[in-house]
Amino acid sequence: MRVVQKQKFPIEGTKRLLPAASNQARGLGEYCRDFLFNPQNILPETIELIERFHVDSVGCAISAIHHRANACTLLRHEAMQTRPEGTSSGGFCFGASTPVNTTKCVAANVSAVREWDSNGTNFGYDKKSGRMAGEFGHNDFYPVAIAAGREAGFDGNQTLRLMLLIDEIRGRLAEVFPLRRYAIDHVHHGAIACAAGYTAALGGTTADVESAIGLVVSQYVPFRALRAGHQLSDSKGASAAFAAETAVMAAQRALHGFRGPQDVFRNPLAIYRLNEPSNDGMSPFDLELGESGNVFAIHAIDRK
């Protein structure tokens, strides 16, 4: 593995704080809607980085499909048997020209992106802010932004912004809550980010985003059993794919009016307070998210 040296540049821009004493799920909904539809200026070095990471991920995906890696081949075959539902425009699997069910498309494409384990890694460590929970994660979720952008009619710039939004949410969650300490797989932070970003992109309200997040946290938490044992299964490489799939499913249900658990970060029986007890009315952490400039978690990702 060769880690590319990060370029040094002045850090500038604004952030939004979601305090532990607030409804952070609702706050994420407001943040997502503002980030996508009331955009502030993002500096070129951030846009260039998200473009580079996306291109890298596509290269990984095409290689995995070409070599017929098992998990992504099976999930792609599964997706190609489907068609878009209702008024949905659906999504395209890598290398295909026929639209398929969006949820199945996302699972297939994220699996392909992730198969070679060659994308960037964030380590959940921001010494300046003191947020150093140290959870890691990978930028495997760009197919969710592509699918949502197609459904929403986004142009390329809007879709890049959605990619950045997903990376920002999962990157900042990694700084404040160490999933691995509680045997929870790191892709869960990505699932929350995907559910929030997808719901907002398709015009969901802040309440819809809150519901989608609540569904992901209460119904679809992946444990690290998928990485344990002497012989690892296809589930390890496909963990991000299944996280993305369930996130999009939760988002679609929320958009159709399903009400998931509210205020889930302060829910005493959700994974956060259950594992890191805090007083009533408090989550275990503040959450701070970049809004403009180059103050984004993506700049802490190591490139392989």
Residue ranges of predicted features:
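Long hydrophobic segments that form regular secondary structure
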Residues: 298-304
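N-terminal core-entry segment
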Residues: 2-295
